[in-house]
Amino acid sequence: VETDIRSKPEGAKVYYKHLDSNEWTYVGETPLVTRLPGVNSWARGYINFKITKDDYADYTSLTNVGFIKSLSQQKVSNFYELTPLAKVQKNMVRVPGGNARLFVSELGDLNVIELNSYWIDKYEVTNADFQKFIDEGGYKNESLWDEIINQDGTIISWNDAMELFIDQSGLNGPSTWSNGTYQQNQENYPVTGVSWFEANAYAKWANKTLPSIYHWYKAAMYWGESSVISPRSNFSGVPSEVGNYNVLSAYGCYDMAGNAREWGTNPHKNGNRSIMGGGYDDGTYYFTDNFSQHPINRYKTNGFRCVITSEDTKTLASADTLIQTFQRDFYSYKPISDEVFNIYNGMFKYDSAPINTKVIKD
């Protein structure tokens, strides 16, 4: 697929690789007109794409070749603005501003909102990261825990909550830890077994925030690429080091599908909070499923990643919208009569006639 690729600054090196390959193929330096492998289709032709230049952060993404061709046909250059290393947030990727649309079951009717550019963690927060939070007194600094904490509908004090947020040995820490630390040789595994409140406290300590569903899904997908991301992600039944499954998101993040579930800010009508992406023991469909848990839940796959945003208060309020999903109460329905059933059933009947197939060309 022929496409026009430009960057700011010019002179950046362009590479691509097939999704199941570890080898990057060099294409040339910007500006350039080149051909990239793929299929002229919105649903097929995905490749990993990378632009690099000394003293600038690499731009990497999962991109759709059909999308690239459509831009080329419209005479729109693929323009990539690289970020100087001096302005890069450590271990984070920049997501450009623009419209954020949700390709998530039950949430497709939510408004499209426009976001400013923002930074999101390239990897899930690791055990080693969370250990620093604990070692620097994260569970002892009440100012990091400014959200109301409730258990079974009852508001509990911060001191009482700290007695709940303990590891398997009774020390403060994730439910999957013991003796105040993680399992041996798992420093680069995602921290899991944390409640929403623990994730939120860590984000405050790190001078970041948890992502809204809009910030999270914009970083995860351009246009619903779950069919190529989910099968290549960690839904294996056991956790893995972050980045071990070599599949990129739309803007170069790892493990947004699988490995650890990831807490978000959005409240749900039932008191839950959004938790996204699915964990290593979930089905692949969790990546695009509208899922939530009670914020005090500390299930073994509950993890998170953080963002740094520059949104105004109004935009953040829109992104952090209350999720009100419809739940049908089947017990409230009464059986219909046979007459009504037969009318509906008749809509699905067809004439069982011979197909009479013919071979036109062998």
What are the residue ranges of the model-derived segments?
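Short beta-strand elements bearing conserved aromatic residues within extracellular beta-rich modules
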Residues: 12-14, 304
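Functional-site microenvironments in short loops/helix caps that host divalent-cation chemistry
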Residues: 95, 160-163, 171-296, 300
